[in-house]
Amino acid sequence: MIGAIAGDIIGSVYEFDNIKTTVFPLFTRKSNYTDDTIMTVAVTDWLLYGGNLVQVMHRYGREFPCPMGGYGARFGQWLCETNPQPYNSWGNGSAMRVSAVGWAFGSLEKTLQVAEETAAVSHNHPEGIKGAQAVAAVIYLARTGKSKQAIRELSPIH
């Protein structure tokens, strides 16, 4: 989770202004967290304390309504709905918020199941689910000491 949040903050200044170099300052005065950090913390809160995932995500969305870069248009609408439904997104938002799932469980199967659950509340398109599962699986496999080669072979998406 720390890596996901640090990466989000480091990349925040380049989100809409891509660079083509590996030499850049990691943190600047303009660096800040984005919607991806907010939803990563929301998912982690849900993993730790339970409750209804949609309600937890809505609470964080209300508490942090204007992150740097904003929420995606459809996700922003989803946050405003009183009865939010999945909207078949195949975007990367589900993958961006799932990192804690890779640390939370003792089996790859459970990790994949919960990654799907965290994705499906909004990103219920098969690609949105696969993205979340891939990120959570790679984190789980690395955490459990698998080699790079084994991670490539065992990752459900490669």
Task: List PLM regions with ranges.
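Structured, active/binding-site neighborhoods that engage oxygen-rich ligands
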Residues: M1-I157
